[in-house]
A protein has these predicted regions:
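AAA+/SF3 P-loop NTPase mechanochemical coupling elements
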Residues: 222-230, 261-279, 327-331, 376-380
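Conserved C-terminal "switch" segment of AAA+ ATPases
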Residues: 69-78, 114-115, 223, 281-291, ...
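AAA+/P-loop NTPase substrate/partner-engagement loops
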Residues: 181-210, 218, 305
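Conserved catalytic/switch belt of AAA+ P-loop NTPases
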Residues: 231-269
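Walker A/P-loop
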Residues: 157-191, 220
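The Walker A (P-loop) glycine that initiates the GxxxxGKT/S ATP-binding motif of P-loop NTPases
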Residues: 163-165, 202, 233
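Pre-Walker A (pre-P-loop) alpha-helix and adjacent loop at the N terminus of AAA/AAA+ ATPase modules
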Residues: 81-94, 101-113, 120-164
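Hydrophobic alpha-helical topogenic segments used for membrane insertion/localization
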Residues: 6-23
Length: 387
C-alpha cells in the first residue's frame, strides 16, 4: 500500500508543481490515504495529534521529501535531510529524535512561496480602506502609494509601515486593513509582553523543554512564508528585562535577509514578510529600528469626527451585533454632543466604542424589561447614564 501511495504522490506532485500547490496536493493525498487504509498497519512513528491534513509523521515527511523536496528552498531541503537522519537514527537520544521530528513537522507544513506579488486592484484597495477607516485621508494616501509601488515592482517595499499615534486612534485597524488588501495571512506580536529575546528566537534543543520562538510559530500558524507581521507597541521593544534586548532580534526580521530560530537551527527566508508596527511614542524607538520603517503619523480625531464616527459607525455596529434596530435606540443631537464632551480628554475612539456598548445595552434592557418600544437618549439621559 505504501508503494501505491508513493506512486500517487509522485503523480500529484508533478501535476501540482506548475500551480505552486505541491504541499497542498500531497497533504490531501495523505488525508485520503488515512481514510481508506483501515486494514493497513500504522507507522510506528505516527504521532498525529493535530490537524490530520498536516505532515507530522516521519514517514509522511520522508514521502514528501521524495516526491516534492525539490520545491523547497535549497537550504531548507538540506536542513530537512539532516533532521530526517537524526529523527531516524538510533544513535541519538529519544529527546533529540523528538525535537528533530517536531522541527520537521513545523517546517514541512509551511508553503514556501515565491516573493512575486500579483497586482492589487487600487479601486478595491481604496474601498477596503474607506470601509475600515473614517477620514484619515493622508494615511490612506500613503497606503495607496505603497500599493501602487507593489503593483509596479511585484515585490514588497523595502520598508515596513510604522503607525505612530495616541492609543485608540485605529492603528491596529489600519494594519488589519493593509493585510486584507494584500490578501495575506497576518499574525500579531505584542512587544509589551516580550521580556526576553529567547521568546522570539526560540530555545536550543539541548534543553528538554525547548521550543520554537514566537516568530517561527507565526510562520507555522500562517502556513506560508508570505505574511503580514503586525508588531504592536514597538516602542516597548527596548524594555526587555531578561537576557538581552528583544529589539535586537527584530532587526534581523526587518532586514529581510533571513531569520534563524535557535530551535529550528535553520535560516528561513523573510523576503515575503511585510512588517507593520504600531507605537504611541516614536521617541522611544531606537534609531536602527526606526530606519527600517516608513513612518506614518496618525493624528487624533477632532470632536466633529468623533461625533460622526459614533453615530455612523460605532453605535450602528453595536446595535446590529445585539439585534436592535436603529429606531429602537436613538441619540439626539444634544445627546451626541454630551457623549463627545464626556470623553473629550481621552485620545482615540476606544472610549466612544465602549460608550456605544453601554448605551445599546441600556436601551436593550429598557425594551426587554420595561417593555418600551424604543429609547431616546438626549443630553440629560446621557449625563445620567455616564455619571
Amino acid at each position: 500500500m505504501r508503494k501505491r501511495t508513493i506512486g500517487i504522490l509522485l503523480g500529484m506532485a508533478v501535476l501540482a508543481f506548475a500551480s505552486g500547490r505541491v504541499s497542498t496536493a500531497i497533504d490531501s493525498v495523505y488525508a485520503a490515504e488515512e481514510s481508506d487504509t483501515s486494514d493497513d498497519e500504522e507507522d510506528e512513528d505516527e504521532e498525529e495529534t493535530g490537524d490530520e491534513m498536516k505532515l507530522t509523521s516521519i514517514q509522511s515527511i520522508t514521502d514528501f521529501m521524495t516526491c516534492a523536496g525539490r520545491t523547497l528552498p535549497d537550504n531548507i531541503r538540506l536542513w530537512a535531510r539532516r533532521n530526517l537522519a537524526v529523527a531516524r537514527s538510533h544513535e541519538v537520544s529519544p529527546e533529540e529524535r523528538r525535537h528533530a521530528q517536531r522541527a520537521l513537522s513545523i517546517m514541512m507544513n509551511i508553503q514556501w512561496k515565491s516573493n512575486y506579488f500579483e497586482a492589487i486592484d487600487p479601486v478595491e484597495a481604496r474601498k477596503i480602506l474607506d470601509e475600515e477607516l473614517y477620514g484619515m485621508e493622508k494615511v490612506k494616501q500613503r497606503i495607496m502609494e505603497t500599493i501602487i509601488q507593489i503593483n509596479r515592482t511585484h515585490t514588497l517595499p523595502a520598508y515596513g509601515l510604522l503607525l505612530v499615534g495616541p492609543a485608540g486612534t485605529g492603528k491596529s485597524q489600519i494594519a488589519y486593513a493593509v493585510a486584507r488588501i494584500l490578501k495575506l495571512p497576518w499574525t500579531t506580536l505584542d512587544m509589551s509582553s516580550i521580556n526576553d529575546p529567547e521568546q522570539l528566537t526560540g530555545s536550543s534543543r539541548i534543553y528538554a523543554n525547548a521550543k520554537p520562538g514566537i516568530i517561527m510559530e507565526a510562520f507555522s500558524m500562517a502556513g506560508e512564508s508570505n505574511l503580514v507581521f503586525i508588531i504592536n507597541e514597538l516602542d516597548k521593544a527596548a524594555s526587555g528585562k531578561g537576557n538581552g534586548n528583544p529589539a535586537d532580534v527584530l532587526l534581523t526580521l526587518l532586514d529581510n535577509l533571513g531569520f534563524t530560530d535557535n530551535y529550528m537551527e535553520c535560516m528561513v527566508p523573510t523576503v515575503g514578510v511585510y512588517p507593520i508596527a504600531t507605537a504611541n511614542n516614536k521617541a522611544d524607538i531606537s534609531a536602527p529600528i526606526l530606519s527600517r520603517f516608513a513612518v506614518i503619523d496618525i493624528p487624533d480625531y477632532t470632536s466633529e469626527e468623533k461625533k460622526i464616527i459614533f453615530s455612523r459607525f460605532a453605535l450602528p455596529k453595536v446595535l446590529k451585533r445585539i439585534g436592535l434596530h436603529q429606531g429602537e435606540c436613538v441619540v439626539t443631537e444634544d445627546g451626541l454632543d454630551a457623549i463627545v464632551e464626556q470623553f473629550k480628554h481621552t485620545s482615540g475612539i476606544r472610549d466612544l466604542e465602549q460608550a456605544a456598548e453601554h448605551l445599546a445595552a441600556n436601551a436593550l434592557y429598557q425594551i426587554e424589561v420595561d417593555h418600551v418600544p424604543s429609547v431616546t437618549f438626549d443630553a440629560e439621559n446621557v449625563k445620567k447614564l455616564f455619571v
